[in-house]
Amino acid sequence: MIEIIPAIDLLKGSCVRLVQGDYNEVTEFNDNPSQQALLWQTLGAKRLHLVDLDGAKTGEPLNDSAIRKIKEKLSIPIQIGGGIRTIQRAEDLIELGVDRVILGTIAIENPNIIEKLSEKHPNKIVVGIDAKEGKVATRGWTNNCEMDATELVKRFSQTNIAAIICTDISTDGTLMGPNLDFLRELALISTVPLIASGGIGSISDILSILPLEQNGINGLIIGRALYDGAFDLAEALKVVKNQDLQDIVNANKDQA
C-alpha cells in the first residue's frame, strides 16, 4: 500500500510552501512547525517528511532548533532533507533520531558519499532527485545541470539506500497534478522503492498515482494541498486504504 507522507517545509523556523521551488514565492502556513507536525501525526500520518529550505539553499543547518522540537513531540518516523552535504551532517541527524536522511545535491556532486553512507547506515539513506524536463536541479533548485534523472536512478539503484524521492519541479506546489509519465519512467528503471512528490492537488491525483504501486512507487509526499484544504489527511489515508479499481479508472478518465 502506498504510504501518504505529509510534508513540512521549514524556512526561517516557520512552516512554508514554495511554488516550483521559487524562494520569492513563499506562503507561510504555520509559525509553529512542531504543532503542525503533531497535528499530522494525530490525523493518522505514519511518517513525516521535513525539508530544511534554508539548508537546501545555503548548506547551513539553520532550522535545527525546530527539527529537535518536532522530533521531541512525535512518535512516528521522520525523514529530512535540505542541505545535507557531508557525511558528518547526515550522521548527526541519524544520531538525533531521524529515521531517514535525504541527500540531493551531494548525491549528484559526490555520489561516493551515498555509497559510503548507505553501507554504514542501511535503510537510513534516501536520495532526492529533483528534476525539470528530466534534467536534475541541485542546491535548492537554484542550479540546473545537464544530468538526466534516469541515469541517477540507475546508479543509486545499485546501493543500499532505503528509497529514492522523485520530485518534478514543474509541478511542485502547483496543485496541477503529478507528472505520471516522469514517475512511471523512473519507477520502471529503479530497483529500490520510489516516493513520488510534486503536484498533488486533489483526491483524483492521489488515485492516479495508485496504479504505479505495481511499478515500485511506495510513497507519496503531499504538502500544499493539505495546507490549502483541497482535502484533509484523513480523507487521503482512507482513499489509499480502501482504494477501489473503479475509482482509479474514473479518476484517470477525468484527467484524460
UniProtKB/Swiss-Prot annotation:
Keywords: Amino-acid biosynthesis, Cytoplasm, Histidine biosynthesis, Isomerase
Pathway: Amino-acid biosynthesis; L-histidine biosynthesis; L-histidine from 5-phospho-alpha-D-ribose 1-diphosphate: step 4/9
EC numbers, comma separated: 5.3.1.16
SUPFAM superfamilies to which the protein is assigned, alphabetical: Ribulose-phoshate binding barrel
Gene Ontology terms: biological process: L-histidine biosynthetic process; L-tryptophan biosynthetic process
Keyword Hydrolase: no
Enzyme's top EC category: isomerase
GO CC terms: cytoplasm
Subcellular locations according to the entry: Cytoplasm
InterPro entries: Aldolase_TIM, His_biosynth, HisA_bact_arch, Isoase_HisA-like, Isoase_HisA-like_bact, RibuloseP-bd_barrel
Enzymatic reactions: 1-(5-phospho-beta-D-ribosyl)-5-[(5-phospho-beta-D-ribosylamino)methylideneamino]imidazole-4-carboxamide = 5-[(5-phospho-1-deoxy-D-ribulos-1-ylimino)methylamino]-1-(5-phospho-beta-D-ribosyl)imidazole-4-carboxamide
Record protein name field: 1-(5-phosphoribosyl)-5-[(5-phosphoribosylamino)methylideneamino] imidazole-4-carboxamide isomerase
Species name: Prochlorococcus marinus (strain SARG / CCMP1375 / SS120)
Gene from which the chain derives: hisA
